[in-house]
Amino acid sequence: MPRTAYTPSLPGLSTTDDLDTIINWGLGADSTAYLARMLTDPDAHGIDLKRTAVLYMATGSEWPETRLLVEEFMLPLLREHGVRFVQLSRSGHLKADGITVLDDSRHPETLFARGPWTLWDELESVGTVPQQAGARKCSLRAKGDVGDRWIAPTMGGRPFRQVMGFNADEEGRRFTDIIASKIPGRRGVYPLIDWGWDRQQCKDYLWKRFGVHWPKSYCVFCCFPVSMGALPAHLERMRSHPDIAGEVLRLEYTAMSLNPKAKLYGKRTLLELFDPSQPRDRACLEAFERELHMPWALYHVRRLFLLSSSGERRPVMRSTERVDLGRARQLGQRLISVSERHGIEVEHDPVYGRARSWVRRRRETWPMAEELFTTAPARVINKQDKNFEPAWDALTSGSTAQLPLT
């Protein structure tokens, strides 16, 4: 798989010279309904398929049923009409790693689930979960930025249309997209909004067309179902895939081990939403327990909550260091024993095994520092923000880690 986007080098010899339309396809009901309807009569919708590319960005954590529906109903449709289908992903954690073209074909046979690097890889390696507050940075990072990095060199500044699958209830996203657009020559097109099609109309169209209920497309660990009022449906999806639920529970549990505030749904955790007395919920919890049967690590975590020169809150700085590797129970007993001997506050989760010792708790007001030792599944890497140590020394006068664990 090529790791960078194809860029035309000889005008007149490239398949992209006449490209004038890009269709963003997120696999969900909205953009799929547009694509399926448009293909019934491309000319009537102002689309020249010879000059069009459908763009899909693989995040790596799409629900299995979405992938199956795409391969059963939509890929045959793309092949029938000879639609150019470009599948992309990030190549690595850093922007400098570039993007990977997973496939670029007018006869696509497979929907690629992931590329060399995924959002899950990123979240798991740093021990965090998506944040509910603010912009959907994870989507921009794994989708928007990836697509833009293919489009910009491919189009080379030529005028083109980019079709976005926002439904009629998402008028605000149209204005946000127009404002955020930075690619030279780009003009956003929003057909579902123009048609007045809301999400239900899109789902109804796909039901009539294919005889299936087309689910919403999003990552299995997405934090937004609760804010969209779709949490019950999301939990049902989890119950249908207990192994996936177990993995997401481990992701959240690890993140909360390093930061108790890292709950998947703001003030609520995924774990608390499962009732062990219910058989289908219990299956998810049992899958979670199996996920925890792996090497664990003892981590030293420090955070800085600093203010700028103008008094505004700066992004939180963090240092995460793996101190030891072993079994959950062994590491937990060690941390509890040492903490109690030194009079340090310690917490223990007897059900799933985490132990956490607070050397320094955060205060209520900024600036402040936080320091703790915790046990967690050994998936988190050593990572420290730039200039962390001098900033830590400046705020704390160098005091750190009074537990003899390192």
Label the model's feature ranges.
Residues 1-406:
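Nucleotide-activated chemistry modules centered on ATP-dependent adenylation/adenylyltransferase
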